Design a protein with these regions (language model features):
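C-terminal hydrophobic structural anchor segments
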Residues: 235-272
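Long, charge-rich alpha-helical interaction segments
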Residues: 2, 7-15
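A short core secondary-structure module
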Residues: 128-164
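Glycine-rich flavin
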Residues: 17-130
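A structural signal for well-ordered alpha-helices, especially hydrophobic packing surfaces
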Residues: 59, 218, 225-228, 244, ...
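Glycine-rich beta->alpha junctions and the first turn(s) of the following alpha-helix
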Residues: 168-234
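Glycine-rich phosphate/cofactor-binding loops in nucleotide/flavin-utilizing enzymes
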Residues: 265-306
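Glycine-rich, charged/polar anion/phosphate-binding loops
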Residues: 125-126, 165-170
Length: 306
């Protein structure tokens, strides 16, 4: 990743997020997680997340976008059929698609109704998303009431039935600020569906959430590295950050091994990798908060001395 060049957009431009997207498309980083058989670069997860971490030291919003993109590529590898992978991944590399997501498996909205020939119609308020107006493809979720389960699907952002409007307040992973999606009779074709509703989740499904937590841990470590060294090197922060760095490295190795297992992956192996990612996220967040508290204390002391 050190060979790539990323240039921050001018914050005075009317659409700075468009500048972020253009920077990523020009960087050569979008194909890192795509296997070589699909014309990608096939880097391991340790290298990918190290790049996200270092990028977060410079431009946190850009790092968030890059992490989200790679998580969607991973989702296609984990959840998609061989035909879906052959259709989506080479096109993503060739056309430099930027991916994001509107997946929320905790809410029973939006709603999906079965449509003809195995498709679905989706309507209602979707998830709050991070800067989706300049991405090319989305992973979305919808609630299917008859099966009392969610589906996960792929859709292009310009598809009829997707309305991107307003600013979301931002909460949870990757949502410092974003857009709110609404769906109006959004048609999903059978080939769009990565996870049909009502089927038991496979072991690889756990890895998706674990990867999200591992990405957040690396973003937190990158943000902590932006705190001046004389501040971050005091108190409990150094111990926490060193432990978090080791945990994210171990978790990345665990996920790499899990991906290599393919269809032979067990629930036990998937759960172990995801648990390690959760521990890394918790320690990284604690280290970041320790840095920020120390920085705030130093600022107050400096202000009192002036």
């Amino acid at each position: 990743m050190s060979e790539a060049r990323l240039h921050s957009p001018d914050p005075r431009t009317p659409r700075p997020m468009a500048g972020w997207a253009a920077s990523l498309r020009d960087s050569g980083l979008l194909a890192l997680a795509v296997p070589r058989v699909f014309a990608g670069m096939e880097r391991d997860w340790g290298e990918i997340f190290a790049g996200v971490r270092h990028l977060a030291e410079q431009e946190l919003e850009l790092a968030r976008r890059l992490a989200l993109h790679h998580l969607q590529i991973a989702s296609i590898l984990l959840l998609g059929s061989p035909e879906q992978q052959r259709r989506l991944l080479p096109a993503s590399v060739e056309r430099r698609w930027l991916w994001s997501e509107a997946v929320d498996l905790r809410r029973a909205q939006p709603e999906a109704q079965e449509h003809w020939r195995g498709g679905f119609l989706v309507g209602g308020r979707g998830s709050d998303c991070f800067a989706v107006e300049d991405v090319d493809r989305l992973l979305i979720s919808a609630w299917h009431a008859p099966s009392r389960a969610h589906l996960i699907a792929v859709a292009e952002t310009g598809r009829a039935g997707i309305d991107i409007s307003g600013l979301a307040d931002g909460s949870g992973l990757f949502l410092p600020a974003g857009q709110r999606l609404h769906y109006q009779r959004l048609r999903l074709h059978p080939e769009d569906i990565l996870v049909p509703p009502g089927l038991p989740p496979p072991p690889c499904g756990q890895l998706r959430e674990g990867l999200t937590r591992l990405a957040q841990a690396n973003l937190d470590l990158g943000q902590a590295a932006r705190v001046p060294g004389d501040v971050a090197g005091q108190g409990e922060a150094p111990r926490l950050l060193a432990l978090a760095l080791r945990l994210v490295e171990l978790a990345a190795e665990s996920f790499q091994a899990a991906f290599a297992r393919g269809g032979a992956l067990t629930f036990r192996e998937s759960a172990a990798a995801s648990l390690l990612a959760s521990e890394a996220e918790a320690v990284a967040r604690a280290g970041l908060l320790a840095c920020l508290r120390r920085q705030a204390l130093e600022a107050r002391l400096l202000g009192a001395a002036l």
